[in-house]
């Protein structure tokens, strides 16, 4: 199988983008893993697929696959790359497009300064809808938020649980660079209280409108930036009374700006940040390569 692809990144969160709008693209999880493999494939945190929508009133369908081959609900950094890709590829000349994601629709707008503004939707804090199992736990209130105790390697971490269309667990730490993200991240990601696993966010408060953030992403590990993770962290910080919008989010890959008016019911978060094309190419992806990679990773 020969595939044309575009390699892109949003604040260092990198993607293989495929045009499934003008050609059929049907990949197995093993083939997704092969494309995302940094040694034998193109290499990426996620694979993004552009398709024709299956619902009325939208321009495109936006699908996201993690580097482990699993399909996920949302990716904010990928959304910015998505709108740049469809414009650069000539699939649309609109500055603003409405796209179908796994849970609903979002609006993406290319701004005059080259950054992309993404309507990320309204954050959800109901544990059942994240989902997060609270049975037997006693939460504690902080501002308008509820923090939940989570046993992580024998230590209790107090977390906010948020859905941005995908699940997030956010905790505040004193020094995000010194914190053992690579130790605690995978434990939180697969914690039994998150039945669909979770993205683990570690937020350091720099000021009332500025944070540093690291995210250990579900199915991808720590990435240089996570758009939904930035939104979840800012939403949790505002609800806890720690932050005021707009908030500048520093990630290892770059800066994002998140705006949210928590006082208004059902108000969406808005995320602004960069999107860049790295290169375009074509790759031969025989079934044997995908199978060999799948076997080597399972060994």
Swiss-Prot record:
Keyword Acetylation set for record: no
Any one annotated GO CC term: cytosol
GO molecular function, one term: diaminopimelate epimerase activity
Cellular localisation: Cytoplasm
Functional summary from the UniProt entry: Catalyzes the stereoinversion of LL-2,6-diaminopimelate (L,L-DAP) to meso-diaminopimelate (meso-DAP), a precursor of L-lysine and an essential component of the bacterial peptidoglycan.
Protein family (similarity comment): Belongs to the diaminopimelate epimerase family.
Database matches in HAMAP family: DAP_epimerase (MF_00197)
Subunit structure: Homodimer.
Protein name: Diaminopimelate epimerase
Lineage: Bacteria, Pseudomonadati, Pseudomonadota, Betaproteobacteria, Burkholderiales
């Amino acid at each position: 199988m020969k595939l044309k692809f575009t390699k892109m990144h949003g604040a260092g969160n990198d993607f293989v983008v495929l045009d499934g709008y003008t050609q059929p693209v049907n990949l197995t999880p093993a083939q997704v893993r092969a494309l995302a493999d940094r040694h034998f494939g193109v290499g990426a945190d996620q694979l993004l697929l552009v398709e024709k929508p299956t619902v009325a009133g939208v321009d495109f369908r936006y699908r996201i696959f993690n580097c482990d081959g699993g399909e996920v609900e949302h990716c904010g950094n990928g959304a910015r790359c998505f709108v740049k890709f469809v414009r650069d590829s000539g699939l649309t000349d609109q500055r603003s497009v409405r796209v179908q994601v796994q849970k609903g629709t979002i609006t993406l707008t290319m701004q005059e300064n080259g950054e992309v503004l993404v309507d990320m939707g309204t954050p959800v804090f109901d544990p059942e809808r994240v989902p997060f199992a609270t049975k037997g736990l006693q939460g504690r209130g902080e501002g308008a938020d509820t923090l939940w105790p989570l046993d992580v390697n024998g230590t209790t971490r107090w977390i906010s649980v948020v859905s941005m269309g995908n699940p997030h667990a956010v905790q505040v730490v004193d020094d995000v660079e010194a914190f053992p993200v690579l130790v605690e991240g995978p434990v939180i990601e697969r914690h039994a209280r998150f039945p669909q696993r979770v993205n683990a966010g570690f937020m350091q408060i720099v000021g009332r409108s500025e944070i540093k953030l690291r995210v250990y992403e579900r199915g991808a590990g720590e990435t240089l930036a996570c758009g939904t993770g930035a939104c979840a962290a800012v939403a949790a910080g505002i609800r806890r009374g720690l932050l005021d919008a707009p908030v500048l989010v520093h990630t290892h890959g770059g800066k994002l700006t998140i705006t949210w008016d928590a006082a208004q019911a059902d108000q969406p978060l808005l995320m602004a940040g960069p999107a860049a094309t790295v290169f375009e190419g074509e790759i031969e992806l025989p079934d044997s390569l995908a199978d060999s990679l799948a076997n080597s990773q399972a060994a």
